[in-house]
Amino acid sequence: MRRVDLGPCAGLLHENDPDRCVVVLPGMRYTTQAPLLWFAREVAATRGWSALEVLDSLPEGDDPFGWARDRARRALDRAEADEVVVIGKSLASAAAGLVADRVLPAVWLTPLLDRPRVVDDLSRAARPALLIGGSADEVWVPDALADSGLLQVVQLDGLDHSLQRPGHPGASLDALRAVATRIDRFLDELG
């Protein structure tokens, strides 16, 4: 792996198949080193995909949605593979419009479905998108989505915005395994 320059931040490139790359986008307080994104990247690596992680956190005072879209744009501009899949957590879903415009498949972990713009942008997906959220997450509002036929919605009962069950580490680990398994199936279905 090697560090790459993304302008205002760095990226970490894990090199495997140069023709296939997952772009891993952090949330506002959820870095690419946190469990969901770490294991999403690991799943992709076992399938031979390269991965480009955005190594950044929201600077104090910045517009969070503008920050998320900017970092996504910079990472996508840097990804040189023929096949690119976006994997993003929470605030990263602010870039769903950019992903739709670039006709890319995506995995959105706990997307902000309480935000009309995010919902509208997700509904414009031109390639398959996997959305995973927990029923105990206030921003998880899957009924807000229009059924485009390309959105695969997975709801995990009793899980919060971190896709954890507070006070139950074993159940949280089971959830992490379920998320990794579902991401693996999604990548397999893409071919």
Where does each model-flagged region fall?
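Acidic catalytic loop of the alpha/beta-hydrolase fold
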Residues: 135-140, 161-162
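A conserved short beta-strand
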Residues: 102-116, 128
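Gly/Ala-rich beta-loop-alpha elbow adjacent to hydrolase catalytic centers
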Residues: 84-97
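Catalytic histidine-centered segment of alpha/beta-hydrolase-like enzymes
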Residues: 159-175
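Short beta-strand/loop motif that positions the catalytic acidic residue
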Residues: 125-126, 131-133, 137, 156
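Serine-hydrolase catalytic machinery in alpha/beta-hydrolase-like enzymes
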Residues: 2-82, 165
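Conserved loop-alpha-helix segment in the C-terminal half of the alpha/beta-hydrolase fold
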Residues: 140-156
